[in-house]
């Protein structure tokens, strides 16, 4: 607890220095506009309050654009079928552009008369070679056919367990383990993204995500004291999976990112959105990517 308080104090101290540099003698205002608050759901507003209390310098990132995932107007009850379609979309979009993924999904929808097939229908259709051939013609590789069938089997055979699993709270690791163990093509990263966009879990953090790594590099670039403290207090080193890549920004190891993110717990999912925005150099492209993430 003592160490966490020290990190919190360093984050806030570095933030105050940065704000003072930019604002000079102008007063600091970190209260989100009432209209902004009214449009977002309560748990997101609570997250913003917590994050700004920890680091006021993040105010502009939060204020400048709405967060589609947390808008009241986008909140609808999700069914087991909705979860299946979201995970199926994740599989379809792997290793290809968003536009290509949308095109493939649209062809699947067209094949099934205007709606994405539910898991029970796909479970039966994967037993029929002729139907499998029709699905594959929509643009699915052999590997993605295997992945999609695996997902349909998982939902069909374990739907009662899944309903219970997805309906519980504070079981993020259990959800990740179940998806990764039972569904071919769903790894830890995909499972974490589903926790955020599908189950709306608020305390997820994925240091292995390239955008998060880039945003974190920018975030820490003006916090020298915090960086020194994080480096000094390392106990267990968890190497970044993207460490070997050549980028023009510094890549931090996973343990450094995770330790820093703990300051913003239990709202690290929102902190991830902030880091994604910090990583972007094109606001319009960033907002479009967020919208696609919410829909996928």
From Swiss-Prot:
Q: Which PROSITE patterns does the UniProt entry name for this protein?
A: ALKYLBASE_DNA_GLYCOS
Known InterPro entries for this protein?
A: Alkylbase_DNA_Glycosylase/TA, Alkylbase_DNA_glycsylse_CS, DNA_glycosylase, HhH-GPD_domain
Q: What broad class of enzyme is this?
A: hydrolase
Q: Which residues carry this modification: Phosphoserine?
A: 110
The residues annotated as site (Determinant for substrate specificity and/or activity) are 189
Q: Does the keyword Zinc-finger apply?
A: no
Q: Name the residues annotated as catalytic in the UniProt entry.
A: 209
Q: Does the keyword Phosphoprotein apply?
A: yes
- Its domain of life reads Eukaryota
Question: Which PANTHER family does the UniProt record give?
Answer: DNA-3-METHYLADENINE GLYCOSYLASE
Q: What is this protein called?
A: DNA-3-methyladenine glycosylase
Q: Which organism is it from?
A: Saccharomyces cerevisiae (strain ATCC 204508 / S288c)
Q: What is the lineage of its organism?
A: Eukaryota, Fungi, Dikarya, Ascomycota, Saccharomycotina
Encoding gene per record: MAG1
């Amino acid at each position: 607890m003592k160490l966490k308080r020290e990190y919190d104090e360093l984050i806030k101290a570095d933030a105050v220095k940065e704000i003072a540099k930019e604002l000079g003698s102008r007063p600091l205002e970190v209260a989100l506009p009432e209209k902004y608050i009214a449009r977002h759901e309560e748990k997101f507003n609570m997250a913003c309050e917590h994050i700004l209390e920890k680091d006021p310098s993040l105010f502009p990132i939060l204020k400048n654009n709405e967060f589609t995932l947390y808008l009241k107007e986008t909140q609808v009850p999700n069914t087991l079928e909705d979860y299946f379609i979201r995970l199926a979309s994740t599989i379809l979009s792997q290793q290809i552009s968003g536009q290509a993924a949308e095109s493939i999904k649209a062809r699947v929808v067209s094949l099934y008369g205007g709606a994405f097939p539910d898991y029970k229908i796909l479970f039966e259709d994967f037993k029929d070679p002729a139907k499998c051939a029709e699905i594959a013609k929509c643009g699915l590789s052999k590997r993605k056919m295997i992945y999609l069938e695996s997902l349909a089997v998982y939902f069909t055979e374990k739907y009662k367990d899944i309903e219970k699993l997805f309906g519980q709270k504070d079981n993020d690791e259990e959800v990740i383990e179940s998806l990764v163990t039972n569904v071919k093509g769903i790894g830890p990263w995909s499972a974490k993204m589903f926790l955020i966009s599908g189950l709306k879990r608020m305390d997820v953090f994925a240091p292995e995500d390239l955008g998060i790594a880039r945003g974190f590099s920018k975030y820490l670039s003006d916090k020298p004291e915090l960086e020194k403290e994080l480096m000094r207090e390392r106990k267990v080193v968890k190497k970044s999976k993207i460490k070997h890549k050549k980028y023009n920004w510094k890549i931090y190891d996973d343990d450094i990112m995770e330790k820093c993110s703990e300051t913003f717990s239990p709202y690290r999912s929102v902190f991830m959105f902030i880091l994604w925005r910090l990583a972007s150099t094109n606001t319009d492209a960033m907002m479009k990517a967020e919208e696609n993430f919410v829909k996928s």
